[in-house]
Amino acid sequence: ILAGLFFLCGLCCRAQVLPLEENVVLNTKEGQIKGKLLLPGGVKTCPVVLIIAGSGPTDMDGNSAIGNLRNNSLKFLAEGLAANGIASLRFDKRGIGTSASAGKEEAKLRFEDYVNDVTGWIDYLSKEKRFTTITVAGHSEGALIGMLACQNRPKVKGYISIAGAGRPAYEIIEAQVTAQQNPEAVRKEVASINGSLKNGKEVSDVPAYLQSLYRASVQPYLISWFKYNPRTVIASVKVPVLIVQGKNDIQVSVEDAEFLKKGCPAA
């Protein structure tokens, strides 16, 4: 938890000793998932934060291939932590960037694959004697992945949700469709498809205008994702929780943070 607070309060600080960067690898059945450890200079042991990127083709630095969006937000987070004596591990998700070789066919990918990958990274860090504690920090979709992965992992001592949804994914999608002022027929179609998917049933007759969102190959992933309610999941997190949310986020609102708070009143 202190890791998140240090970042928020002192991102612009500069360490007197340059941080050290190490390339690290997590081996999976599909291939290697690659990441980077950023270690504060001049220390032998320290806390470490595992940083989980958000949805879509977002890399370990927080940059997305969609729209060529480059903000280096997660890289800056890692540097801010290092400046405050805290190590971090960030990684490219399977199928993304340097971890492209570990990608699965879209039809075979499940939300739990990402959760299992993060669990693997937690176990990796747990074996490292250089780290005194582990905090898991997830952004956007990574927040839900993190809160699932950190459970039953005794070395994890804290969890941070950064702009994490407080509602099931299908509710977020429906809210976005409404906010975009789509015709009522579109909103009803989206709600109908989501209704089937959240009950574990694939939909064969998806209209052409919704194929990009509900194509047949992505429906199994959506089914695996829709079954999780972040408000319920966060209630089962047994370590201290920090919820961070901006007011100008166009996808996740302050209301989502409030939903998470209701699920975990001690946060």
What is each PLM-predicted segment?
Residues 16-44, 48:
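N-terminal cap/lid segment of alpha/beta-hydrolase-fold proteins
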Residues 43-45, 49-81:
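Short, surface-exposed "cap/lid" segments of acyl-processing enzymes
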Residues 72-100:
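Conserved alpha/beta-hydrolase
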Residues 73, 106-128:
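Alpha/beta-hydrolase active-site loop
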Residues 123-179:
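Primarily recognizes the serine-hydrolase "nucleophile elbow" in alpha/beta-hydrolase
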Residues 160-236:
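Accessory cap/linker subdomain of secreted extracellular hydrolases
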Residues 237, 243-245:
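Short beta-strand/loop motif that positions the catalytic acidic residue
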Residues 239, 252-263:
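Short alpha-helix in the alpha/beta-hydrolase fold that links the catalytic acid
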